[in-house]
Amino acid sequence: MAKKETKHTPLTKLKFQDPIFGISFHPEQPRFVVGSSTGTVTAYKYSVDPQSATCGAPEVVWTTKRHKGSCRALIYSEDGSSVYSVGSDGVIKRADSQSGKVRAKNTESLPSTPSCIVRSEAYVAVGCEDGSIVAFDKTSLAEKHRAEGAHDGECVNALLELTHQNKHSFASLGSTTACVVDVRKGVKSTSDDQEDEILCGTMAAKDMGVCGMSQGQITTWTLGFNDQQNRVKLSEESIDAVIGAEDDYEVYAGGGEGIVWLANVKSGKKLDQFVHSRNDEVSFLDLDYQYRLVTASMNSLKLWPTADDEQKQAEVAAAKGAEEEQKAAPSGPPRKKHKKVKNKAHNPGVAHFGDL
């Protein structure tokens, strides 16, 4: 257990009418996009006050019916100028992130329903439900390479870029195995059977991958992804989303309990926790451009404060409390109390006229 259970309050939250299947936050601006079960993609903006660390409700920038069926996944480009999305219609599109206008699309290359999308130095790569991985040109969306047969034809749940090997390599996670794939040559290696479904993954550092498992654990992997090296038990329910934190070897992980844990995968310790919901699972995690944690279920999204944000909030609250206390105090200087003059006592050394 974490040493201390800290209660955090989200900066802002958003509820959705239709179930969401994907979120992505802009790498340089306070913006994000959401893809829904109806095929709609919506872009939002928000503003966090730099002095008080408060945030109002997100505002819609644009919304459009982007895919027939559902939008299965989406992601910003490296500089945030484009948004890539894939749908159950088998189409991948690149749109201008400011206007939402489509700049390129490919309607023919996906062999089955897409399940995930990742951006790398060289490609936009899409994992599919039949174990295929298709790499696209980032500008034209022309198909560049295709690898098939990962996970014995089972669904690709997550893709991780492995740029330390070369720009063509990815780790594919799905079913009960992890595969290293060169999109030019196909599957290079497959891990031992984990006897537990691998649902998600992230890179915790340049030399370590982390996977979320269906039995409530996160597992650590070396770069060869041959077998897990260590495991950390977080929950009695599945870990459906995991993302690297700002510091190496630290990750955020959440799932069926509706709780997100910050954990150090080297020490195996829980460092902090964020309660997204007591009723809904955590399906998606992201970080905004200032490394604020984002948690989302299929019907709600929350943006959480950083430690610096919480420090600013505490300072503002303390200053406000002092101001209110001062207002409640009586105005003006305190009145001085006048002493009553007592009758002087008879002085036996002086004669009274009546005695003369």
Curated annotation (Swiss-Prot):
WD repeats (start-end): 15-54, 66-105, 107-146, 193-231, 234-275, 277-314
Record's compositionally biased regions (Basic residues): 334-345
GO cellular component: nucleolus
Membrane-spanning residues: none
Keywords: Nucleus, Repeat, WD repeat
InterPro entries: WD40/YVTN_repeat-like_dom_sf, WD40_repeat_dom_sf, WD40_rpt, WDR55, WDR55_POC1
Annotated spans, Disordered: 312-356
Protein localization: Nucleus, Nucleolus
Domain of life per record: Eukaryota
Stated family: Belongs to the WD repeat WDR55 family.
Full protein name: WD repeat-containing protein JIP5
Organism name: Yarrowia lipolytica (strain CLIB 122 / E 150)
Gene name tied to this protein: JIP5
